[in-house]
């Protein structure tokens, strides 16, 4: 192990001079020797080497606040990448990017550690899966079903309900699912992390969840690496032969942190100011989130869509890696329909008659066709009114409006805001309900009976009271 000295500080990016023959490798972790008493900088501050500039100088990014750093301070090379604790001792704990506990519950009692940079599983180790994962959310189970061991993205702009949807999925899947979960909070609000922790605690599933946070207020180094920290913990459980749920909120902030770091390192930006290595960074992370023959990782990732533009390079790069995409729409949220999932924009590789069965496939396609017809007729209705439509079109519009309202559902996690108890709807009930609407069995019921109910029987009961 060699020691070096800081020669330049520019925000979180620090240049460190080492002896020429003892330069640390790329991604090696370095620690500050002088911190703590001698200055107000963080004690034992960790850096990660990003570039070797030459002449013994390396450029590193700080994994913590770089306040109080100055030239000449001594830095020690650890000779290995950042490693974090893994295994059962991490369950029920909240950790930061370096795997240090931040929940005031004492140290993490495990000797087992693993480097956060790992190669993706080899091609012959991968295990594709076609088992469906029931979420209890009607619109998702019907139009964009999830696969066990698959990858799911929740896409949406600001304030359309990504985090609430994510929390409901955690509530419905993680509590029913007997396996373990890992939650990585990447560059999101600290308040949401706090809410998540208390929710898990109240529902007594905290002992099955490991939580890693690198929130909005932290330097870009933390936000860039915290997804890898969470993933490393999930991989360790997977390699023991377990089935893991891996939640990431939010993948966009991972990209954004990469953009900040890239600019600080002096790389030329590419389209829209993103880092030139955007596709490679995303690929490195996403290729590791996968199921092997030993165990499975089912990942659910929230993806912020800047300015509601799905063609922005960051969400567009994320799309490539996913099995199911759940697109949240501001127009649907404006109608007061929650979850605001767009059934025409959301897709799933699992929506195939060989996977979900013929009945499910046909009902889902009927629902989409009816909604698509309504979308096409909307301009005519706006100009000429409903009276000018043919009887078939009037019927299609009436059914589409019922379907649209029946796609809404009260959530368990939103009970405090809505006052209506959350509903978990089994897949069979979902298919039966939409089949009845599409076949015309419920044409006589008013459309408001279908709004914010669980199963179709509740809608029929509600219609009697109207």
UniProtKB/Swiss-Prot annotation:
Pfam families the record matches: ATP-synt_ab, ATP-synt_ab_N, ATP-synt_VA_C
Binding site for ATP: 156-163
Keyword set, alphabetical order: ATP synthesis, ATP-binding, Cell inner membrane, Cell membrane, CF(1), Hydrogen ion transport, Ion transport, Membrane, Nucleotide-binding, Translocase, Transport
Localization: Cell inner membrane
Enzyme Commission number: 7.1.2.2
Broad class of where this protein is predominantly found: membrane
GO terms for MF: ATP binding; ATP hydrolysis activity; proton-transporting ATP synthase activity, rotational mechanism
Quaternary structure note: F-type ATPases have 2 components, CF(1) - the catalytic core - and CF(0) - the membrane proton channel. CF(1) has five subunits: alpha(3), beta(3), gamma(1), delta(1), epsilon(1). CF(0) has three main subunits: a(1), b(2) and c(9-12). The alpha and beta chains form an alternating ring which encloses part of the gamma chain. CF(1) is attached to CF(0) by a central stalk formed by the gamma and epsilon chains, while a peripheral stalk is formed by the delta and b chains.
Protein's recorded name: ATP synthase subunit beta
Source species of the chain: Polynucleobacter necessarius subsp. necessarius (strain STIR1)
Record lineage: Bacteria, Pseudomonadati, Pseudomonadota, Betaproteobacteria, Burkholderiales
């Amino acid at each position: 192990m060699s020691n070096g000295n800081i020669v330049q500080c520019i925000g979180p990016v620090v240049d460190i001079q080492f002896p020429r023959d003892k330069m640390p490798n790329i991604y090696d972790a370095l620690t500050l020797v002088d911190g703590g008493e001698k200055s107000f900088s963080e004690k034992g501050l960790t850096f990660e080497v990003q570039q070797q500039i030459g002449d013994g100088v390396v450029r590193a990014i700080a994994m913590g606040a770089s306040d109080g750093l100055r030239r000449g301070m001594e830095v020690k090379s650890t000779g290995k990448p950042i490693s974090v604790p893994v295994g059962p001792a991490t369950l029920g704990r909240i950790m930061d990017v370096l795997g240090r506990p931040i929940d005031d519950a004492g140290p993490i009692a495990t000797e087992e550690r693993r480097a956060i940079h790992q190669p993706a599983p080899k091609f012959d180790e991968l295990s594709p899966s076609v088992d469906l994962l029931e979420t209890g959310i009607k619109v998702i189970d019907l139009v964009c079903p999830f696969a066990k061991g698959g990858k799911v993205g929740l896409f949406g702009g600001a304030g359309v309900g990504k985090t609430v949807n994510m929390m409901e999925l955690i509530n419905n899947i993680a509590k029913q699912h007997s396996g373990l979960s890992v939650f990585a909070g990447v560059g999101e609000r600290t308040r949401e992390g706090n809410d998540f922790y208390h929710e898990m605690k109240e529902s007594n599933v905290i002992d099955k969840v490991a939580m890693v946070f690198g929130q909005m207020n932290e330097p870009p180094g933390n936000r860039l690496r915290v997804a890898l920290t969470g993933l490393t913990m999930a991989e360790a459980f997977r390699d023991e032969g377990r089935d893991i749920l891996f939640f990431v909120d939010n993948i966009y902030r991972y990209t954004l942190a990469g953009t900040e770091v890239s600019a600080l390192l002096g790389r030329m930006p590419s389209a829209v100011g993103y880092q030139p290595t955007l596709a490679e960074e995303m690929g490195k992370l996403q290729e590791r989130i996968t199921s092997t023959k030993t165990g499975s990782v089912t990942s659910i990732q929230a993806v912020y869509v800047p300015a509601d533009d799905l063609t922005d390079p960051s969400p567009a790069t994320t799309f490539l890696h996913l099995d199911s995409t759940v697109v949240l729409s501001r127009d649907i949220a404006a109608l007061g329909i929650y979850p605001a999932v767009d059934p025409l924009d959301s897709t799933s590789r699992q929506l195939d008659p060989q996977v979900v069965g013929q009945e499910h496939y046909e009902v889902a396609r009927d629902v989409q066709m009816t909604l698509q017809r309504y979308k096409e007729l909307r301009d005519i209705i706006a100009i000429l009114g409903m009276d000018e439509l043919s009887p078939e079109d009037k019927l299609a519009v009436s059914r589409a409006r019922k379907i649209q309202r029946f796609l809404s559902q009260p959530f368990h996690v939103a009970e405090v805001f809505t006052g209506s108890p959350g509903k978990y709807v089994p897949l069979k009930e979902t298919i039966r309900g939409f089949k009845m609407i599409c076949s015309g069995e419920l044409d006589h019921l008013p459309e408001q009976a279908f709004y914010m109910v669980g199963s179709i029987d509740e809608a029929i009961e509600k219609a009697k009271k109207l």
